[in-house]
């Protein structure tokens, strides 16, 4: 994947970059693996805003992704690498030898025509899915399960990667993208390799309209609101926050407060917390 930088022919084009989509080999998705989805614009069933700054955006079809990878000992051929508007990573279309078609997250360097498979006896190569107990230490992995059979939940964004550090009884030590080291059941599955489209984070949208295409609405600063709308609001001119430290719109401290529940049951599985946490 290469980054295209546009000439500043207009203010919106200045500093705008995009992907060249050189890895994409198929434009139209597989119809049997599509589902319609409705956008709620951040509202719940009562019509109340539960997530701010969402709404609009281009209409999208949801691609059904196989995060479980539980078709053991059945080989599949990569037929295409496709764009998925619902995620940052690209997806790969697989044709299994028994006639089943499926989408998976496209790992880095996965090519059309590559044969992939799942199961404890699969080879250690990008795109293959194995239980953590069958993956040697030092191997890069992604799409990691937290509960056996539930499907991958960790390391699914573009360019992310985790690493197997070793086995410890019924658990496997894994270092995540954030630097966190945690225990995961060795019967959980993961896919070999790192997630592709690794230069996604380098893309600059360049203009507000491109953000609106993604379904993201503008965000106003609290300091320009009225005092009944935000703790930072009110005052004459450019007034300071007026509090000991910045606050969220709901009056809670927004800096330096831990958001993780220290009494969570999974806390005992974390060997080392992510970078920045002590």
From Swiss-Prot:
GO terms for biological process: cytoplasmic translation. GO terms for molecular function: rRNA binding; structural constituent of ribosome; transferase activity. Residues 210-278 are annotated as: Disordered. One of its GO terms (cellular component) is large ribosomal subunit. SMART domains: Ribosomal_L2, Ribosomal_L2_C. It holds the Pfam family Ribosomal_L2_C. Residues 210-219, 252-263 have a biased composition (Basic residues). Keywords: Ribonucleoprotein, Ribosomal protein, RNA-binding, rRNA-binding. InterPro entries: NA-bd_OB-fold, Rib_uL2_dom2, Ribosomal_uL2, Ribosomal_uL2_bac/org-type, Ribosomal_uL2_C, Ribosomal_uL2_CS, Ribosomal_uL2_dom3, Ribosomal_uL2_RNA-bd_dom. The keyword Cytoplasm does not apply. One of the primary rRNA binding proteins. Required for association of the 30S and 50S subunits to form the 70S ribosome, for tRNA binding and peptide bond formation. It has been suggested to have peptidyltransferase activity; this is somewhat controversial. Makes several contacts with the 16S rRNA in the 70S ribosome. Part of the 50S ribosomal subunit. Forms a bridge to the 30S subunit in the 70S ribosome. Belongs to the universal ribosomal protein uL2 family. This is Large ribosomal subunit protein uL2. It comes from Lactobacillus gasseri (strain ATCC 33323 / DSM 20243 / BCRC 14619 / CIP 102991 / JCM 1131 / KCTC 3163 / NCIMB 11718 / NCTC 13722 / AM63).
């Amino acid at each position: 994947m290469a980054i295209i930088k546009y000439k500043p022919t207009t203010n919106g084009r200045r500093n705008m970059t995009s992907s060249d989509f050189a890895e994409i080999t198929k434009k139209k998705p597989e119809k049997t693996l599509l589902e319609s989805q409705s956008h709620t614009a951040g509202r719940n069933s009562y019509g109340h805003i539960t997530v701010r700054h969402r709404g609009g955006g281009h209409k999208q079809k949801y691609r059904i992704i196989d995060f479980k990878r539980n078709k053991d000992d059945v080989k599949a051929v990569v037929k295409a690498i496709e764009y998925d508007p619902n995620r940052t990573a690209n997806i790969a279309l697989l044709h299994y030898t028994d006639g089943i078609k499926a989408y998976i997250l496209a790992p880095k360097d996965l090519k059309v025509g590559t044969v992939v498979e799942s199961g404890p006896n699969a080879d250690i190569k990008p795109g293959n899915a194995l239980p953590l107990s069958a993956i040697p230490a030092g191997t890069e992995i992604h799409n990691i399960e937290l509960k056996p059979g539930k499907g991958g939940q960790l390391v699914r964004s573009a360019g992310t990667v985790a690493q197997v550090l070793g086995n410890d009884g019924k658990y496997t030590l894994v270092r995540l993208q954030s630097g966190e080291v945690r225990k995961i059941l060795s019967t959980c599955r993961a896919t070999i390799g790192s997630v592709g489209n690794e230069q996604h984070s380098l893309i600059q949208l360049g203009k507000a309209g491109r953000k609106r295409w993604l379904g993201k609405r503008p965000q106003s600063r609290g300091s320009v609101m009225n005092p009944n709308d935000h703790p930072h609001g009110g005052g004459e001119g450019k007034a300071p926050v007026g509090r000991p430290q910045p606050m969220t719109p709901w009056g809670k401290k927004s800096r330096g407060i831990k958001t993780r529940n220290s009494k969570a049951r999974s806390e005992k599985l974390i060997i080392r917390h992510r970078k920045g946490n002590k």
